[in-house]
A protein has these predicted regions:
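Short, flexible, mixed-charge acidic loops at enzyme active sites
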Residues: 63-68
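Conserved CoA-thioester-binding segment of acyl-CoA-metabolizing enzymes
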Residues: 1-60
Length: 68
């Protein structure tokens, strides 16, 4: 399973946090992937909107994963 799903659909960049069992806590690897996508989209004039969402019902994001 991928911890963060990054995709582009037209002018929308989408980042989905995908660690519902860990309340979508961010790992260092996830942060690096998100940063890479944001830098890429900043340089892409086609991307006008960045949408961040999360899988799971309990939490959007509980913050940084302290066990990582």
């Amino acid at each position: 399973m991928t911890d963060v799903i990054i995709r582009q659909n037209g002018n929308v960049g989408n980042i989905t946090l995908n660690r519902p069992d860990a309340l979508n806590a961010l790992t260092y690897d996830m942060i690096l992937k998100i940063e890479k996508a944001l830098i890429s989209w900043k340089q892409n004039e086609e991307v006008k909107i960045v949408l961040v969402d999360a899988n799971g019902d309990k939490a959007f994001c509980s913050g940084g994963d302290v066990s990582d």
